[in-house]
Amino acid sequence: MKTLLLTLVVVTIVCLDLGYTLTCLNCPEMFCGKFQICRNGEKICFKKLHQRRPLSWRYIRGCADTCPVGKPYEMIECCSTDKCNR
């Protein structure tokens, strides 16, 4: 009986997500379907749009610990919920 109880406790601990991990989209296309699980300490999802030439944008998405600072010809959006950087 003690073995069964100990086994249940171990399985419960292994299966529970004891900490919240943020999930952000991570791909260079306009319409993104790939995502990544952020590392410990990364609590921000971001989307960076970099204008390469008129009417041509490069998309960069991912996780960050703080919201990145934009450079000229860049737009940056930051958020803090799962897959919010669409």
UniProtKB/Swiss-Prot annotation:
Tissue-wise expression: Expressed by the venom gland.
PTM annotation: The disulfide bond Cys-27-Cys-32 is probably not needed for efficient interaction of the toxin with the target receptor (Torpedo muscle or alpha-7/CHRNA7 nAChR).
GO CC terms, sorted: extracellular region
The organism's place on the tree of life at top rank: Eukaryota
InterPro entries: Snake_3FTx (IPR003571), Snake_toxin-like_sf (IPR045860), Snake_toxin_con_site (IPR018354), Toxin_cobra-type (IPR054131)
Gene3D superfamilies: CD59
Subunit structure: Monomer in solution.
Task of the protein: Neurotoxin that irreversibly inhibits nicotinic acetylcholine receptors (nAChR) and allosterically interacts with muscarinic acetylcholine receptors (mAChR). The loop II is involved in the interaction of this toxin with nAChR and mAChR. On nAChR, it acts as a competitive antagonist (muscle-type and alpha-7/CHRNA7) with IC(50) values in the micromolar range. On mAChR, in presence of ACh, it partially inhibits the effect of acetylcholine (ACh) (allosteric antagonist), whereas in the absence of ACh, it activates the receptor (allosteric agonist).
Protein name, UniProt field: Tryptophan-containing weak neurotoxin
